[in-house]
Amino acid sequence: MAMEQLLELLQDNAQLTPAQLAVMVGKEEGEVKKAIARYEKEGVIKGYHALINWERTESQKAAALIELRVTPKKDTGFDEIAGRIMNFSEVESVYLMSGGFDLAVTVVGRTMQDIAMFVAKRLSTIDGVLSTATHFVLTKFKDGGVVFNS
């Protein structure tokens, strides 16, 4: 079975049933179920989630991309700092980057003020964090491959 094709279909729409996926990839439903179970066990498939357009609800949220310059640790490099950052509930993603900063962190909070306080009191105080630059999301046009229409 073409692993890439099955994974791309699931990435685009995780609600497809194994029966639907089997038709789309030209395989038996049982083969597809086994492949999905194997991908989940091996950590290829890391999870399933709903992509919410919070602007269409009564409880809007604020989001930000935060650039961090950090000093890597001698034995663990960037992994230790990234690991500490990942554990905050406000953090949605952490990326090691090339270019003018080291880590890119996406954060969600109830308000911009909540995010600002998170950066000031929790993120910037981590040992090894040299500087932060916070960029608030003003409008989300596309996320996770899905177009958001206002």
Over which residues does each language-model region extend?
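A compositional/biophysical signature of low hydrophobicity enriched in polar/charged and small residues
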Residues: 1-150
